[in-house]
Amino acid sequence: MTLTERLREKISQAFYNHGLLCASYPIPIILFTGLCILACCYPLLKLPLPGTGPVEFSTPVKGYSPPPADSDHKQGEPSEQPEWYVGAPVAYIQQIFVKSSVSPWHRNLLAVDVFRSPLSRAFQLVEEIRNHVLRDSSGTKSLEEVCLQVTDLLPGLRKLRSLLPEHGCLLLSPGNFWQNDWERFHADPDIIGTIHQHEPKTLQTSATLKDLLFGVPGKYSGVSLYTRKRMVSYTITLVFQRYHAKFLSSLRARLMLLHPSPNCSLRAENLVHVHFKEEIGIAELIPLVTTYIILFAYIYFSTRKIDMVKSKWGLALAAVVTVLSSLLMSVGLCTLFGLTPTLNGGEIFPYLVVVIGLENVLVLTKSVVSTPVDLEVKLRIAQGLSSESWSIMKNVATELGIILIGYFTLVPAIQEFCLFAVVGLVSDFFLQMLFFTTVLSIDIRRMELADLNKRLPPESCLPSAKPVGRPARYERQLAVRPSTPHTITLQPSSFRNLRLPKRLRVIYFLARTRLAQRLIMAGTVVWIGILVYTDPAGLRTYLAAQVTEQSPLGEGSLGPMPVPSGVLPASHPDPAFSIFPPDAPKLPENQTLPGELPEHAVPAEGVQDSRAPEVTWGPEDEELWRKLSFRHWPTLFNYYNITLAKRYISLLPVIPVTLHLNPREALEGRHPQDGRTAWAPPEPLPAGLWETGPKGPGGTQTHGDITLYKVAALGLAAGIVLVLLLLCLYRVLCPRNYGQPGGGAGRRRRGELPCDDYGYAPPETEIVPLVLRGHLMDIECLASDGMLLVSCCLAGQVCVWDAQTGDCLTRIPRPGPRRDSCGGGAFEAQENWERLSDGGKASPEEPGDSPPLRRRPRGPPPPSLFGDQPDLTCLIDTNFSVQLPPEPTQPEPRHRAGCGRSRDSGYDFSRLVQRVYQEEGLAAVHMSALRPPSPGPPLPQASQEEGTAPEKGSPPLAWAPSTAGSIWSLELQGSLIVVGRSSGRLEVWDAIEGVLCCSNEEISSGITALVFLDRRIVAARLNGSLDFFSLETHTSLSPLQFRGTPGRGSSPSSPVYSSSNTVACHLTHTVPCAHQKPITALRAAAGRLVTGSQDHTLRVFRLEDSCCLFTLQGHSGAITTVYIDQTMVLASGGQDGAICLWDVLTGSRVSHTFAHRGDVTSLTCTTSCVISSGLDDFINIWDRSTGIKLYSIQQDLGCGASLGVISDNLLVTGGQGCVSFWDLNYGDLLQTVYLGKNSEAQPARQILVLDNAAIVCNFGSELSLVYVPSVLEKLD
């Protein structure tokens, strides 16, 4: 068993056990699921759900004035301004963007020196801003006059009163962590701990206090012990109530004069106005609510047609609750994780949850209600989940793989969507497996057995349903036709064989193909590819940055690389998405970063300088506020009870400030405990993975950014998905026996459907069958009409058996066998030599030597030993493994003794040798005269003298030789047996009396196939011709015997009187050249006759007048098997291994499939599938409507053609001394029955299913009569 098969079996077993758990304890599981839903939706109670994202509108700074409050001043005039751009904004936001670095960097500096000194300069900047005064001709303006004055915080924010300003200007900076007191900052030994002390204990929310005070996202700030880029970024946020252009201009000029940025190219041209809609908008919820209402109605009206469901409303409501709960859980978890949507792509997330959730509901419902209805509820739930386990896990793994690939493209839009999708998939899978499955088990449990029988329509009790393409005239006949007394009616599993309405067909089509999920996955892949291709700061930038950072070249080896500003910006604020600036510190190979210092490292006395990093500015720095959560500004104003719903704010152009600090300032600002603390990690980590470090010197709680854990978890999941992907590719690209010298080691392989394993092993039983003995050689032809069974061996002996009791009713002697019944293995050897000596040609003297055409070996004649003596080497028995069966003490009526010699005397060889001499003489006469001599008394008289069936227990009769030829084909209908011989003779025998009724005496080409249908006989001959006969029965008043030679016209053939009825056989039509080569397959049904030949063609004839309707061409080899039924569905198989389905009404080919590696040996169809077997010892089951291969069953060697269909959902196959029963719908091995110890070494060569639920197995010269086990009758 391969790794994939073991994994599939484990998954199936896990789902089976989970189904048993859900069905056994439904109430506790529903309560547990409800608590989980409430817990995941708890964040929604505190954090209101957003409607849509904020809307932006830009205006130029030059000549800006607030719009008038009267919205009617421009009515009737076309304008590009939005409707909400009316009146003054709530506030004007002015950000002073500070970039600071310590340069040049010394090796004795610590990691904490990267941000301690730059943060200390924030206090000086705040003082400069507060002290700025505008003096002009109109007077003086200070900050207190133009800024937004705030009052108290909300009562629930007492912890933030020492951090946020009250009763003054709304001015925010990182200094607020220390109440804008430099002494507090200087005395703080744990800066990072102070910054993160107000962070939530679980995960960061969308707008944290750190983001509010720093004004930039946390990963862009550079305040981290593990960042490689020694640059700190933060903003000082000023909130103005009125727009004063002169004051703002003077403030910008003063700050840029005090802290110039020589390489800054930021544009100060536009104001950006941001409008915030209502957080809960009814208009935005209408489409989503409408979608769920439509979902409820669709599921309800669809489940009204499912009779296996008790409560239609309950199932529809459960489906809607499942999908809605999945959405709420997803949004709640995303809110808890801080994953708030900032792009329009996040708004389609609820609708994706609806689509995926609906499809999973349909899949689970279809799988569970398709299980057998007579099983216990928990077993039905377990089987339903187990059957879809592999499909569910495969789809989930595929979706997660696509999401992981999209996440690691490092495109922000794709990452946000992927994070939303991961949460949605996990929550949806959780609810499907727990909530909906449990509710479905409760609903099915309420379905009473009486209620089930009452709801089932009468068509469900029929053995077969209406297949696709059946003419309307057969539908009524099938519905009212009662079952015959000897036909077992097997109840089909659930309702899968019923005529489904269109709405259920749509549901099952979606559930079977998972079309919606596949389209979503394909669309996601295309969308990710487009964004990766068009995003300038995505994966390519990140890879280029990694190559630049990890370059082993020493300092000064390469100069700055000129990069276009539009493609790769010189300094992106995100360390993970940026390249080092041209002057970034490049260390030699033997030099470590400051983060690589070991614990308790002592700074070196000697200082080695490296090139100072140059602070650069790029276009992305102009709108860094866009990377903040869209709740950033509403959260800040909500703290002061100011709402931004249906209002807007205006963002002024950023004021850039660059700070360069020398190492001496960094050393002076260092805390005494910094040198004694292990601040640096043992190894450097990529930028952006770590944003926080240990809390303090005391070894307290470590504040790690959740990004590391997310990346680690996603990386592990990506590795698992990659391994599974490689396994799937191995399974698809490599054959089953890849790397193995032979076939599978097991006796039989299960089906390949995921529903094959239900967690239990199929039972194996052993029964003692009825053994039908009496043939001297291997049985070649079998025929039955339900009550009688006729068999014929290679010796030409025909036996008629009672299919109910197994008794031998009649033995029809072959007219003149050349050997005694004691021949055994000697005659097998003799037959082989005779076949070789005949050269494959049938002669009247040797009628038993010509088997059917496809089995006749050809070869040179044996060398003669003496010139005038016959060759007696054929009498030597070299088969020492075959022993003569001992005579039973009390022979049973149904068992015939194999030998007629007595125990007193030895074996008499005289007759055997004498026959060989006689055969030599007869052969010489045959070669000279080309006409056989008279064999003695006429055959009808011999049959009449022999009488009817011989007495039970009497030895076999010795028959005289004849020129009739060996039997090549055999058919049975009623009490008449039609025999086709190699000499071309057609015989009709009475199966009860054992007498010859009539025959066609004209010597012609051998009859290779027969059809006996409604008193019409069609004989296919070796030369490719067809003969159509009709039988007539006349009641004669006196025994009469007719003599004469039959003619080929309309005159009757010579009938032979039998009992009181005379059967006459008339040749009505002849098709002399139906095919160019021998006809190998012949079938008739629904008034049509189909022939298959070695000339690669099939022909369709009308049975009543032998008119050729169609010539079907589609095979590249000889036709080996043909199937046709009353629904005008025709299937054919050939030596090319192909299977073709044809429409008999139009003569067109419906499908063509290469099914086997070799000849197709047998072919049959049910209402839903096509079953084929081949010389490769595989039985393949195909979907009849689509032509898709469902699964395969590997047979034992030599048992490939031994199969039979008991009903539309039950298949029987033969093996080494056993028969196996399979469920056709799923490929499950239901039961294996061993036929006693005597048959273990014998393969079942042929299986014939009788109408009385009996199975006839051909084990060489013996037949075994087996009845369908009662266990299977109950299962069906």
From Swiss-Prot:
It comes from Rattus norvegicus (Rat). Residues 284-442 form the SSD domain. Glycans are attached at N263, N590, N641. Residues 1-18, 301-312, 366-401, 445-518, 729-1276 are cytoplasmic. Belongs to the WD repeat SCAP family. Loop-1 binds to loop-7, enabling interaction with COPII-coated vesicles. When levels of cholesterol in the endoplasmic reticulum increase, Loop-1 binds to cholesterol instead, thereby disrupting direct binding between the two loops and preventing the SCAP-SREBP complex from exiting the endoplasmic reticulum. Residues 731-1276 are annotated as: Interaction with SREBF2. This is Sterol regulatory element-binding protein cleavage-activating protein. Keywords: Cholesterol metabolism, Cytoplasmic vesicle, Endoplasmic reticulum, Glycoprotein, Golgi apparatus, Isopeptide bond, Lipid metabolism, Lipid-binding, Membrane, Methylation, Phosphoprotein, Repeat, Steroid metabolism, Sterol metabolism, Transmembrane, Transmembrane helix, Ubl conjugation, WD repeat.
